[in-house]
Amino acid sequence: MGPIIVHFGFCGSEKAYRKTMKRMGVSDPMPFVPPGAGASVRTFEKPGSNMTILMCYDAESESGSTRNQIDSLIAHEAAHVAQYCLEYMREKPDAHETFAYIVQYVFGFVTNELWGD
């Protein structure tokens, strides 16, 4: 088996999510973020194509949250991204180091998008 490609994206608003869904050709997407959740992870896989994973973050609903609370929420969702990646790659269930690297990458990517530092 060769390389396994997984596309990852981040949508920090419902507007960005709708734009991404349109660009991906998804005509009936799942809701942006479930009510009260603050963030969610969406997966998309077309036959014969690679998996796309989107982390969605509702900045409006989290406007009263501290940076630490937001970062914790992003870390939580990054763990879900890693779970989906490992499942898609058919990685061994005990692939702890691979899981940790994925979480680290996703968390760093998203917090850089949010905070720019």
Name each region found by the language model:
Residues 1-23:
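Charge-rich, low-complexity N-terminal segments
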Residues 68-69, 73, 94-98:
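Short, conserved micro-motifs enriched in small and acidic residues
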